[in-house]
Amino acid sequence: MNENKCTDKINNLPKAIFIMGQTAVGKTKIAEILKKKLPVEIISVDSGCIYKGMNIGTDKPNVKKSSSDKYHLIDICEPNDYYSVENFRLDALKIMEKISKKGLIPLLVGGSMFYFKSLLHGLSNLPSYNIENKNLLKKKINEIGWYKSYIFLKKIDPIFASNIHPNDHYRLTRALEIYFSSGNIPTNLFKAKTKKLEYNIRQFSIMISDKKILYKKIKDRFFNMLKNGFKKEVEFLKNKKQINKNMPSMRCIGYKQMLAYLSGEINYKEMILFTISATNKLAKKQSTWLKKWKNINYIYNKDVYISSEEIFNILKKDNFID
């Protein structure tokens, strides 16, 4: 296929806009500003915002009842539910199709990079989550211990085992679950991908290049969360929703540390230090991902209104919008 035919094929595909970036850089605000200018509906790409009642610690948008202000994939699960990247991909694809059929453009915004990657490049055909199998596996792991479980994984799939830490109990459990459910090792299954995303996409990365400025934003944001009642939010989840540290929702930064504090595992000062440190590490990890990302426009954010204008102008220049 020559270049012109390839371009024509892409231009005939339904459109989508991706806004990703480091944590605390103003992605959501930029998306909200763009929504006032563009024929879009917003889809959240955030592994924390899917959970009901987890509002302050995820810096969740203030979702109004009006359908015109609707965010998709926000408040769709209880904190004790299991929601995987596979679930996200299926849900996001269905919503993107519905938005496109309305003649609108899906605008996906968030910082969960693996979610974005799953949309763009597909996922391996892994066995679906099964609570009964998981409980049986947990029972077996409790009998033999985490170390022996890791040694077993290393024996059956040394490649996958070499890419995870022995103390990464979540990924270790998932790897063993895949093996016992399918009879195949994770490394082999990860080679087979589902279909890639057939959309004409414009991707934007919102970045803050000055680490001191970014880390100050992260620190200030967390202290605002504490001021706005984050402790009470997690207390409610702990007491009323019976959440515990082993649930996927409690892997979210801030919730994990606050729950540890409320359970008496760490003190208040440690909770603050550990949360800010973990968020800084996340921002660094996101930056590493994004620097390697293909076909992306980097927007260095000093002001959300200026950044949204930059994005709008790029879309206009590319004839992506009328």
UniProtKB/Swiss-Prot annotation:
Which keywords annotate this record?
A: ATP-binding, Magnesium, Nucleotide-binding, Transferase, tRNA processing
Would the keyword Zinc-finger be found if you checked this record's keyword annotation?
Answer: no
The keyword Thylakoid appears for this protein: no
Q: Which reactions are catalysed by this chain?
A: adenosine(37) in tRNA + dimethylallyl diphosphate = N(6)-dimethylallyladenosine(37) in tRNA + diphosphate
Gene Ontology biological process: tRNA modification
Output the Gene3D superfamilies linked to this UniProt entry: 1.10.20.140, P-loop containing nucleotide triphosphate hydrolases (3.40.50.300)
Q: Which cofactor does it need?
A: Mg(2+)
Residues binding substrate are: 23-28
**What's the superkingdom here?**
Bacteria
Q: What is its EC number?
A: 2.5.1.75
Q: Name one Pfam family in it.
A: IPPT
Residues crossing the lipid bilayer are none
Binding residues for ATP, per the UniProt record?
Answer: 21-28
Q: Where is this site: Interaction with substrate tRNA?
A: 112
GO terms (molecular function) for this protein are: ATP binding; tRNA dimethylallyltransferase activity
Cross-referenced SUPFAM superfamilies = P-loop containing nucleoside triphosphate hydrolases (SSF52540)
Region annotated Interaction with substrate tRNA sits at: 46-49
Family membership? Belongs to the IPP transferase family.
Do you know which NCBIfam families this protein is assigned to? miaA
Query: What does the UniProt function comment say about this protein?
Result: Catalyzes the transfer of a dimethylallyl group onto the adenine at position 37 in tRNAs that read codons beginning with uridine, leading to the formation of N6-(dimethylallyl)adenosine (i(6)A).
Instruction: State whether it acts alone or in a complex, and with which partners, per the record.
Output: Monomer.
Output this protein's name. tRNA dimethylallyltransferase
Q: Which organism is it from?
A: Wigglesworthia glossinidia brevipalpis
